[in-house]
C-alpha cells in the first residue's frame, strides 16, 4: 500500500534520468531509487585525473543507479547502494577509456551483531573471486568515505566502496561486476529484513 511517485528530469547539456520515491506504506518510511544517463562535451582535465587518456577527450557518457532505503521498523537498518560507469569518447564518438564505481553501506539504528557480520561476510564472499585484497581495500574505502571528521566517527557499520576501477579486460566485464554487486546488496539486505521485520 505504499505510494510511489515518479520524477523525470532532463539535463540541458545532455541526458537525464528518473527518480522514484516510495513512502507512506507499511514498510518504508521513505525509499528512493534514482536512474541517470548523461552525456556531454569535453571534460576539464581535473575530472580526468585518474584516467590514462586525458589527451583523448572529445566527450563523455555516464550512467548510474542509486538506492536509499529508510524502513519504518527501527530494527531494520537504513541502507544505501550506488553503481556508476563513466566513459570517455574519442574524436569518432567511440569509447576509448572507461571506469566504474560504486558501493553499498548499512546504518543500523539498533545494531545486531549477526546482521553486521553477515553483511560483511556477504561482501567478502562476492569480492573474493575478483581479488584477494579487494574486500579489505573496498571496506577501508567505505569507512574513510563515510567518516565524519567533526564527530570523530563514521556513518553506520560500513560496507564496500570503490571508484575509478578498471580491473577488467572489457567494459562488459566491468558492467557484469556492477550487476553482481547490486545483486549481492539486494540479497544481503533482504536477509536482514526477513530476520528483523517482526521485531
Each model region followed by its residue ranges:
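Short secondary-structure capping/junction motifs at helix and strand boundaries
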Residues: 2-4, 75-76, 135
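Flexible, active-site-adjacent loop/turn segments at secondary-structure boundaries
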Residues: 7, 33, 74, 102-104, ...
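Internal mixed beta-strand/loop scaffold within catalytic domains of large alpha/beta enzymes
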Residues: 17-100
Amino acid at each position: 500500500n505504499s505510494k510511489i511517485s515518479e520524477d523525470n528530469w532532463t539535463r540541458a547539456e545532455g541526458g537525464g534520468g528518473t527518480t522514484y520515491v516510495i513512502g507512506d506504506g507499511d514498510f518504508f518510511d521513505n525509499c528512493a531509487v534514482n536512474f541517470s544517463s548523461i552525456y556531454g562535451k569535453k571534460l576539464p582535465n581535473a575530472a580526468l585525473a585518474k584516467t590514462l587518456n586525458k589527451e583523448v577527450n572529445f566527450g563523455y557518457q555516464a550512467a548510474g543507479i542509486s538506492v536509499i532505503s529508510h524502513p519504518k521498523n527501527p530494527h531494520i537498518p537504513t541502507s544505501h547502494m550506488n553503481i556508476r560507469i563513466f566513459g570517455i569518447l574519442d574524436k569518432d564518438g567511440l569509447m576509448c577509456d572507461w571506469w566504474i564505481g560504486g558501493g553499498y553501506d548499512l546504518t543500523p539504528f539498533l545494531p545486531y551483531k549477526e546482521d553486521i557480520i553477515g553483511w560483511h561476510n556477504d561482501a567478502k564472499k562476492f569480492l573474493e573471486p575478483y581479488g584477494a585484497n579487494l574486500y579489505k581495500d573496498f571496506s577501508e574505502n567505505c569507512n574513510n568515505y563515510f567518516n565524519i571528521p567533526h564527530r570523530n566517527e563514521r556513518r553506520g557499520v560500513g560496507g564496500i566502496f570503490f571508484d575509478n576501477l578498471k580491473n577488467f579486460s572489457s567494459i562488459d566485464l566491468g558492467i557484469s561486476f556492477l550487476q553482481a554487486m547490486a545483486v549481492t546488496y539486494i540479497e544481503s539486505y533482504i536477509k536482514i529484513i526477513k530476520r528483523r521485520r517482526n521485531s
